[in-house]
Regions:
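His/Asp/Glu-rich metal-coordinating catalytic cores
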Residues: 2-28, 32, 39-177, 193
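C-terminal regulatory/interaction regions
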Residues: 2-3, 11, 225-332
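A short, well-structured beta->alpha microelement
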Residues: 6-26, 79, 124, 214-250
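Short, well-ordered alpha-helical microsegments
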Residues: 43, 63, 105, 126-128, ...
Length: 332
């Protein structure tokens, strides 16, 4: 009997539709939707899904964080899946596996009777903190798909970031700007690296941290920016203040040093942007070599590069086809 290939497509949201049965990180009316994590490019049209999808599937942390971000998801539609837990939808088995990106991020494994499809979602540290999953078809977002997008310092960036913040704290408060989820990851890293200054958080970052603690993350001493305790701490001038990257566009106040977190820097681990402004090349995504390593070790029969969430997806696809000899499709 010939193998029945699952029908797969990618829509204009970057949503991955498999066998007209499920969509991952995108919206189609009535279809169950898997949400790999809370970043905006993966939750496009989520309000439509809250209204019209039959089910919303994700890790418990991701689903709780979405509520903090203002999505009112009816309990009847919520399907929390822990890592290594699965659910059957029609003839498909859906399994979530860990990805090292922001807390709660999942890779998605979809199994049919004779095919195994893996969507990596966003990841970094493949083979170390992100398990590399074998697949017949591997769907990947080539976020850093150009061969020049390499950060040789990725392996020690956590220490660089901690050392810089520690050094700047000696001169006064430090303001750190990052996306939702990335801030909580950095708080965790700083604590694990022994930084003990109090953390002060803007409202939404604070609520996200509170939820993450229920799921086992530990952030030590942190305070809501509007609390009386935070006022006292800020008067002392020894603290790290975390807020969303968007806030860095406003003129910083006269206090302290300001550190922006961004993966779009490939020459050095950190650089000075101004007298008290710094950029640290702290990324939540694997660089070009990390993407290649994942594909190489997963040994898929074919790779589908998700063009909607890739930068230089064509270059990445060409590299995989020529250097690794694997069949590649760029969709949509």
């Amino acid at each position: 009997v010939a193998e029945k290939q699952p029908v797969m497509s990618i829509n204009s949201d970057g949503g991955i539709i498999i066998d007209s049965t499920v969509i991952i990180d995108g919206h189609e009316d009535l279809l169950p939707r898997v949400i790999t994590h809370i970043h905006s490019d993966h939750i496009r049209r989520l309000r439509a899904s809250v209204q019209k999808s039959s089910l919303l599937i994700g890790t418990p942390l991701t689903l709780e964080w979405l509520k903090v971000l203002g999505f009112k998801i009816p309990d009847s539609k919520i399907v929390p899946l822990n890592y290594d837990q699965s659910i059957e939808l029609g003839e498909l088995k859906i399994l979530l596996r860990e990805a090292n990106h922001i807390p709660g991020t999942a890779q998605v494994v979809v199994e049919t009777t004779d095919q195994r499809i893996v969507y990596t979602s966003d990841f970094k540290k493949p083979g170390e903190r992100t398990p590399i999953l074998s697949a017949d078809t591997l769907v990947i977002d080539a976020v850093y798909g150009d061969p020049t997008f390499r950060r040789p310092f990725d392996d020690y960036i956590d220490e660089v970031l901690t050392d810089l913040i520690r050094e700047l704290l000696a001169k006064g408060p430090v303001y750190v700007y990052g996306y939702y989820g990335k801030v909580q990851e950095v708080m965790d890293i700083l604590r694990r690296n022994g930084l003990d200054a109090p953390f002060v958080l803007s409202h939404k970052q604070y609520v996200l941290a509170k939820v993450a603690e229920r799921f086992g993350m530990k952030f030590g001493d942190y305070l809501h920016a509007n609390s009386r305790e935070a006022e006292d701490v800020m008067r002392d001038g020894w603290y790290v203040y975390f807020t969303h990257l968007a806030a860095s566009r406003r003129t910083p106040n006269g206090l302290g040093n300001h550190v922006l977190l961004s993966g779009w820097e490939f020459n050095k681990p950190f650089k000075r942007l101004g007298s008290r402004r710094w950029l640290v090349a702290f990324s939540d995504h694997a660089d070009f070599m990390g993407l290649v390593r994942y594909v190489e070790d997963a040994k898929p029969e074919q790779v589908i590069v998700n063009a909607r969430r890739s930068t230089a997806g064509e270059k990445f696809g060409d590299y995989v086809a020529k250097k690794l000899g694997i069949k590649v499709k760029l969709l949509p």
